[in-house]
From Swiss-Prot:
GO terms for molecular function: gibberellin 20-oxidase activity; metal ion binding. Its cofactor is Fe cation; L-ascorbate. Disulfide bonds: none annotated. The active site is at R290. One of its GO terms (biological process) is response to light stimulus. Pfam families: 2OG-FeII_Oxy, DIOX_N. This is Gibberellin 20 oxidase 1-D. Keywords: Iron, Metal-binding, Oxidoreductase. Residues 199-299 form the Fe2OG dioxygenase domain. Belongs to the iron/ascorbate-dependent oxidoreductase family. GA20OX subfamily.
């Protein structure tokens, strides 16, 4: 049987769409999503400037948002506007290449890095209408991004690798600053989570959502919670990000000067369930492609994920067992399709794995 191919140049103009992309009624885009979700706008530079009043206000706003739905936006982040523009241009440059060229970086089953489209993965229904390119980023290995891009796509794409190496370095810096805010808001101090993530082993992902002539029947990305620790997203000027909160879907409007930040499952465990990893999705439209840059902060692969002792007491017992990021990543890549219950299902799986197996007779 020939493997189907997601060729955006062909599919984006089709009046019908393959059945694998059609989502059941009740899961497809809904009219209420036109309502905007107003999330706090956090001045991260003000927080770190030493102004006690600014720091207190940022801490309060972040804490309230993370206990409700886990989403906020960050401005005054220090990311150079030209670097952002370069990063978005490189998204265009990569995804408009002929399909065989993109497939040189094809992601293999069970892996989290490489080029992927809807038919690359292990699922056959409710497929996402998108293409992605993902790669690792580690502060301890500055050459990692460039080496990966050159090894998979060729020397001609070295500049693309250099742009994203710079971008990932800035994302790592920003994520550690956000960790200071999260630590302060949880009462464990600025240094706790910053230290935990200083040696991060993170994932950078370029998202490309082609136009779709049946946008009310499919989704760019289905409803899910991020299994990672923290997501820092920069959207282009085409809306599409939606968050499920208070029983309905609402949109976060793009802002060129802001990054959308959301809590992932791993940080929810690190906060002992205090901060929420919230259900979200991406919708598509029939007119123009949508592009976004997503940096997923992750701890080192074998670092034990456990909340600080100050967040655990008789009234707030441990919400999740100890685990490593490697084990959760492996679970979502090989055993489970990430959704709103990933962390709960994974926790049960961990406990089951730790139980002694009955002897065979």
């Amino acid at each position: 049987m020939v493997q189907p191919v997601f060729d955006a140049a062909v599919l984006s103009g089709r009046a019908d769409i393959p059945s694998q992309f059609i989502w059941p009624e009740g899961e497809s885009p809904t009219p209420d999503a036109a309502e905007e979700l107003h999330v706090p706008l956090i001045d991260i530079g003000g927080m770190l400037s030493g102004d006690p009043a600014a720091a207190a206000e940022v801490t309060r706003l972040v804490g309230e948002a993370c206990e409700r739905h886990g989403f906020f936006q960050v401005v005054n982040h220090g990311i150079d506007a030209e670097l952002l523009a370069d990063a978005h241009r490189c998204v265009d440059n990569f995804f408009t290449m002929p399909l065989p060229e993109k497939q040189r970086a094809l992601r293999h089953p069970g892996e989290s890095c490489g080029y992927a489209s809807s038919f690359t993965g292990r699922f056959a229904s409710k497929l996402p209408w998108k293409e992605t390119l993902s790669f690792r980023s580690c502060p301890s290995d500055p050459a990692l991004v460039v080496d990966y891009i050159v090894a998979t796509l060729g020397e001609d794409h070295r500049r693309l690798g250099e742009v994203y190496a710079r971008y990932c370095s800035e994302m790592s810096r920003l994520s550690l600053e956000i960790m200071e805010v999260l630590g302060e808001s949880l009462g464990v101090g600025r240094a706790h989570y910053r230290r935990f993530f200083e040696g991060n082993d993170s994932i950078m992902r370029l998202n490309y959502y082609p136009p779709c002539q049946r946008p009310l029947e499919t989704l760019g990305t289905g409803p899910h919670c991020d299994p990672t620790s923290l997501t820092i997203l920069h959207q282009d000027n085409v809306g599409g990000l939606q968050v499920h909160t208070e029983g309905r879907w609402r949109s976060i409007r793009p802002r060129a000067d802001a990054f959308v930040v959301n809590i992932g499952d791993t940080f929810m465990a690190l906060s002992n369930g205090r901060y929420k990893s919230c259900l979200h999705r991406a919708v598509v439209n029939s007119r123009v492609p949508r592009k976004s840059l997503a940096f997923f902060l992750c701890p080192e692969m074998d670092k034990v994920v456990a909340p600080p002792g100050t967040l655990v007491d008789a009234a707030n017992p441990r919400a999740y067992p100890d685990f490593t990021w490697r084990s959760l990543l492996d679970f979502t890549q090989k055993h489970y399709r990430a959704d709103m219950k990933t962390l709960e299902v994974f926790s049960s799986w961990i406990v089951q794995q730790q139980q002694p197996q009955p002897a065979r007779t």
